[in-house]
A protein has these predicted regions:
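Histidine-rich, glycine-flanked metal-binding segment
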Residues: 22-24, 29-36, 44, 48-90, ...
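Polyanionic/metal-chelating signatures
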Residues: 142-280, 413, 419, 431, ...
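C-terminal cap of metal-dependent C-N hydrolases
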Residues: 42, 397-430, 572, 912-952
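N-terminal helix-cap/turn-to-beta initiation motif at the start of protein domains
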Residues: 30-37, 73, 426-439, 452-455, ...
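Beta-sheet ligand-binding and adhesion/scaffold domains
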Residues: 95, 441-450, 480-553
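His/Asp/Glu-enriched, well-ordered alpha-helical/loop segment
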Residues: 33, 41, 111-122, 133, ...
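Tryptophan-anchored aromatic micro-motifs
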Residues: 39-43, 428-452, 457-466, 474, ...
């Protein structure tokens, strides 16, 4: 019987699948036999939650012919007994590049300098990161080794895309079988359109930031839907983009914040994305749930952190350690919140880690049926392929794998995988060799011999009735066994050579004796030798230490978001910035996020009373020029104008500098684009609502602003050879950039008015807003001639420059600035840090103020922003500005420059309760902010901060010690990796 079974299996493995008549010629006789097989009496997981016992599966011509009990065996059909096996539908990976790695990016022929345009031959898009015309199926070639690895982890189908660029082209749905030609493995040629926020491998200068990538993607959408083309240009990329609009869109992002950014783009164009996320969605689960968009999540959970040095506490952040503990809980949290998701193997160091990581997710709360659904039915549904894959049902591809136990039993092993009906034995799985005592029998010998076999055996001894009969050499590896008997060691001269493999508990195989006679043999397990320590480890449930999510997910975050309170400050010195001036021994009441009133001897039922005797209360500090809380680049310097990019697209609510600046009394900031080009990007106005999501930091109904720049930075004087080919290269050229764009902006306004359906140009849209007084300029500036030039350009085109920032030669042209109506946001005492500021003086702010220009002091620096109160004090030192007026330099005046003074900047009933409690005169170097409120919510408290610092150290120590124990217990670990902190300035460029 065993000979017949073994022969049947051998024949089965030699057959090929016949789907249809092939156009490819044969090299030798063709095998016309159909690949038909019956799997009997298995436990079949037809679909997640639908388990059928003692069930048969009939496979014909690569598809499932029938599923049920006692199915009649067709003539000539092979039959396999699976009575002790579990069968699962093959997994589907929706984010893979399997088989399409032969695609190559454009090789640049350009020498030094910036690469401004695509070098791809043909009528394609101007930017190499945009290649929707790429079809992954044209590059697909099956890879035997990788396919075997994927099958070994349960994957029978992948959706393969070119993982390079912003618009990556169409993805192809393929099976992980092995056939020639590879086209026979293609299930569906064009299934989805791949997108991302990463420019990929191109060395083209634009985009150089994530906000640039987002702007480029948005512009591509508008190019695709334009009803009237601006020229008769033939563009194959845009044509392909329009074709791809009928496909599913899969966008790859790298954090939960980027998920929200992707959703923002999708909503703008009425699209639904499938978002390949980063596995950190638990950090803001409510916001992710509100997007109502499906996810593809990785399970590349970080290894536990192993710490050998107490100094490691200073090298690693609390959020890093917390992520290690919480990442395995992410799939379960998503499932419990009803968020639709599928799971990808992307991001794993090795594919063989997949099942281990999946079981870890199950241990940490992911329901088993939900886990299976995330790998079968959900991905099939998301790409509209439920008729072909995802379950074990009649008519679908015969894609399923066989386990010797329930998949979620940690001791379970996969024995085989059927892909499009073809059976693949698995040779790359963890060895399931049985160590133990066996009985050896053959078809040509009636005797049964006792033998001990282990993986470490080098010799084999066959014992009959306690007497050594045969001995020889043996090798056991990956469930395969080979042994031969040495004639010299044989007592009767017999020579046997045997090969076989493990099937369940026993070994079966074929052999040949010294006479050339073939036979079958069996090694029947009598007694298994078990490694108890290994089994105990497999059975043990190792859970990550419990820890809580913080908002934001950094060390100084809160477990719960704070709320607005009714607070009465008693007996304080109030700096009103109003006609009342500075009031001593005065009370102030805030409630519902607003200033209610101030006066003497106030009382209010239910109010929290704070004794502010000897202390000062002011409106919050406003930083007119900041670069904190920005993700992935502050400059988009690849072109002379980047008016299309928006800082608001990349606001980073997790930046610890928000908290640090709250500790310095800052409550609002203008987040500015850098100064890499004459026309920069659009600003974002935020309040420092520590812990709020990015969109909730934004100040609603704030006017739009945009960054312009003059001087050394924009003409790239310090960029070296890399910056010698982008226009402009001189100060004269900078003026011509403005002349060009404003004249084009005027024409654009007229054309759009005449033809509202013409192509929308995001760059010129922003320029048009400036000309229509809907967007306002903040201009980086130093030298008086350039300052005067931009005001003249503005006068010519009938708009007003809103603010000159830095403006270190403003004292030279203060009268002209006042006449133009422009404000100044300057440094208090910066000079001599580059040549174009050679004439800077610390009296600059006072001189402009005395002439009548609205003057503010800004930071342009994450550290200086925490000391803007001291910067204001320097206006008193340099120029004798009265204290009350000097304080306005960092409160009311920046509010005026940002058009926010109706809501903030002073203590006035009805204004936002953005207030700071200071320990001393706020202009003093001894003053510290004791409490900072934004919209009446206390986001910083110096006394509570001391407690937080101690709590952070204790929590880091607790988690590290717990992980040290897990590492000692055998769990994979890695050393401490310090997190790099990036601080942006005007001239910062992403690497």
């Amino acid at each position: 019987m065993h000979f017949r079974l073994f022969y049947t299996i051998i024949c089965f493995l030699l057959t090929t699948v016949t789907f249809a008549q092939s156009t490819f010629p044969n090299n030798g006789p063709a095998d016309p036999r159909p690949n038909n097989v019956m799997l009997r009496r298995a436990t079949v997981v037809v679909a997640p939650g639908n388990v059928q016992t003692s069930t048969d599966i009939l496979v014909e011509k690569g598809r499932i012919k029938a599923v049920g009990k006692n199915i009649a065996l067709p003539q000539g059909c092979q039959e396999i007994d699976c009575s002790d096996k579990w069968i699962y539908s093959s997994f589907i990976d929706l984010y893979s590049n399997y088989g399409v790695t032969s695609w190559q990016p454009i090789k640049s022929n350009q020498g030094r300098g910036q690469k401004l345009l695509s070098e791809k031959p043909g009528a394609y898009y101007w930017n190499e990161s945009i290649h929707p015309e790429t079809n992954a199926f044209e590059y697909f070639v099956s890879d035997e080794k990788e396919a075997n690895n994927l099958r070994g982890q349960g994957f029978g189908v992948t959706l393969s895309q070119i993982k390079d660029g912003i618009s990556r082209g169409s993805a192809v749905l393929v099976s992980t079988g092995e056939k020639t030609p590879s086209s026979n493995l293609i299930i569906d040629e064009r299934v989805a359109h791949g997108l991302s926020f990463s420019k990929g491998s191109t060395n083209q200068s634009y985009p150089s930031s994530q906000m640039g990538s987002i702007a480029l993607l948005r512009q591509l959408y508008y190019d695709g839907i334009a009803q009237d083309k601006p020229t008769d240009e033939k563009n194959l990329s845009i044509e392909a983009w329009r074709t791809n609009a009928n496909l599913k869109s899969i966008i790859a992002v790298n954090s939960w914040q980027e998920v929200l950014r992707a959703v923002k783009v999708a909503k703008e164009f009425n699209k639904t994305y499938i978002v390949k996320s980063a596995g950190d969605e638990y950090q803001r689960i409510d916001a992710i749930k509100a997007t109502n968009m499906p996810l593809i999540i990785p399970i590349n959970f970080p290894e536990v952190v192993k710490s050998d040095d107490i100094l490691d506490l200073d090298k690693i952040s609390l959020e890093q350690i917390k992520h290690v503990a919480l990442a395995p809980r992410n799939p379960g949290i998503l499932s419990q919140n009803g968020i639709k998701f599928t799971i990808t193997s992307d991001g794993l160091k090795e594919i063989k880690e997949f099942r281990e990581k999946l079981l870890l997710a199950v241990d940490h709360g992911l329901d088993k049926d939900k886990a299976l659904a995330a790998l079968t039915t959900v991905p099939a549904e998301l790409i509209g392929e439920t008729a072909q894959i995802g379950t074990i049902e009649t008519g679908k591809w015969a894609n399923f794998f066989v386990m010797d136990k329930n998949y979620f039993d940690k001791k379970a092993k996969m024995t085989s995988h059927f892909v499009q009906g073809r059976k693949y034995e698995l040779y790359n799985l963890p060895d399931s060799t049985r160590d133990g005592k066996f009985l050896f029998s053959t078809s040509i010998d009636n005797d049964k011999y006792s033998v001990h076999i282990t993986k470490s055996n080098k010799e084999i001894n066959l014992v009959y009735q306690d007497t050594l009969k045969y001995k020889g050499i043996i090798s056991v590896n990956n469930n395969k066994i080979n042994f031969s008997l040495d004639p010299k060691g044989s007592l009767d001269g017999k020579y046997w050579s045997c090969s076989g493999r493990l099937d369940g508990k026993n070994y079966y195989g074929i052999g040949q004796n010294q006479e050339g006679t073939s036979f079958t043999w069996t090694l029947t397990l009598v007694e298994e030798i078990r490694d108890k320590k290994k089994e105990e480890k497999a059975d043990s449930l190792i859970l990550m230490p419990e820890t809580k999510v913080l908002y934001p997910f950094v060390g100084f975050g809160n477990e719960k978001m704070p709320v607005a309170e009714k607070v009465l400050f008693k007996n304080a010195t109030l700096w009103t910035n109003e006609a009342d001036g500075i009031l001593k021994e005065t009370d102030i009441l805030i409630e519902n996020g607003k200033i209610v009133r101030y006066g003497k001897n106030l009382s209010e039922a239910g109010a929290k009373v704070i004794d502010a005797t000897g202390k000062h209360v002011t409106s919050g500090v406003i930083d007119e020029h900041s670069h904190i809380a920005i993700s992935s680049g502050v400059n988009e310097g690849g072109q002379e104008s980047s008016a299309e990019v928006r800082i608001g697209d990349v606001v980073n609510s997790e930046d610890v500098n928000i908290y640090r600046q709250l500790s310095g009394g800052v409550t609002a900031s203008q987040l500015l684009h850098g100064s890499a080009n004459p026309i920069g990007g659009q600003s974002a106005m935020i309040k420092l609502r520590w812990g709020a999501a990015p969109q909730d930091l934004m100040i609603k109904d704030a006017d739009g602003f945009i960054k312009f720049a003059l001087g050394e930075n924009v003409k790239q004087v310090n960029w070296g050879i890399q910056g010698r080919n982008r226009y402009p290269q001189s100060r004269m050229g900078v003026e011509q950039v403005y002349e060009d764009y404003f004249s084009r902006g005027q024409a654009y306004i007229a054309d759009r008015k005449a033809n509202p359906n013409m192509r929308k140009d995001l760059d010129l849209e922003a320029i048009a807003e400036i000309l229509q007084a809907k967007r306002f300029i903040t201009c980086h500036s130093y030298q008086q001639g350039e300052i005067n030039m931009l005001m003249k350009v503005a006068d010519k085109y009938k708009f007003r420059v809103n603010t000159f920032t830095h403006i270190l030669e403003g004292y030279k042209v203060a009268d002209k600035m006042k006449a133009h109506g422009v404000g100044a946001s300057t440094f208090s005492d910066w000079w001599a840090y580059k040549y174009e500021v050679i004439d800077a003086i610390p009296y600059n702010g006072a001189i402009m103020h005395n002439v009548g220009v609205v003057v503010a002091f800004n930071s342009d620096d994450a550290e200086m922003a925490r000391r803007l109160n001291q910067e204001a004090g320097k206006a008193v030192l340099y120029g004798g500005v009265p204290e009350e007026e000097a304080w306005k330099f960092v409160t009311l005046n920046p509010a005026k420059l940002l058009h926010l003074d109706s809501h903030m900047g002073s203590l006035k009933a009805g204004k936002d309760a953005d207030i700071v409690l200071w320990s001393d005169n706020p202009l003093s170097i001894y003053a510290v902010a004791e409490q900072t409120y934004v919209d009446g919510i206390k986001y910083f408290d110096r006394a509570e901060d001391k407690i937080k610092q101690a709590t952070i150290a204790q929590e880091k120590m607790r988690l590290l010690r717990a992980m040290d124990k897990m590492s000692a217990g055998g769990m994979k670990s890695e050393g401490v990796r310090p997190k790099r902190e990036v601080l942006y300035h005007c001239d910062s460029e992403e690497e």
